[in-house]
Amino acid sequence: MDLILEGSQLALQIHESVGHAIELDRILGWEAAYAGTSHLDLTKLNQHKYGSELMNIVADATLPGALATFKYDDEGTPAQRVDIVKEGIWTGVLSGRDSAAVAGVKPGGMVRADGFGRLPMVRMTNVGLLPGTSSLDEIIQSTEDGVYMETNRSWSIDDLRLNFQFGCEVGWLVKNGKIIDMVKNPTYTGITPQFWGNMDMLAGEEEWVFWGTPNCGKGQPSQVGHTGHPASPARFKETRVGVRG
């Protein structure tokens, strides 16, 4: 069944299945608290297929008005925009000075602490999915058999950021291009690269919204950080969904 996600749910999908997985300290195995490590392998950088050609992810700490925008990170590195996924291919990571030196990449200016007495660590900035050219109406109208889901209710993902299940507050059955009924407690499951590889429609700039979270936890002792996740609605083909009428 085809799955259509509205922007706020897609923002959490980005956070959990992309954002934490591309933190370089997790990729290197230095950090595992709360979110585990990562399925990504640095030897596959610029080769690994993360998703379909519609998938363009950037980490941009310079984005005006977004939740994780700043001038300099807590190591004094200027804020910047880094390409993370380009046309479906994994091209970048979230890094600081130490992790970048080990990996042989340019420091990304992505190290922050939630207070002066805390150790700075790699954190997501504004990790967003660049908009496409469709609209939500067009996506629904072109869907023969699917579910449109809105507003997160629950999430679960393994410690490699691969296998996941998400639940939403409300879902709408879509048949032959029309919404025909509401469904309760809709859920969907997937495996990260296959899920993103099935993205075949993506709404444009008019529906691109600066979503995010003010309370992303990481580290031991725990620290809380702001993360931004700009996104617009998208469709994912052949997704395993569960609904209750």
Indicate where each model-derived feature is located.
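N-terminal small-residue-enriched
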Residues: M1-G245
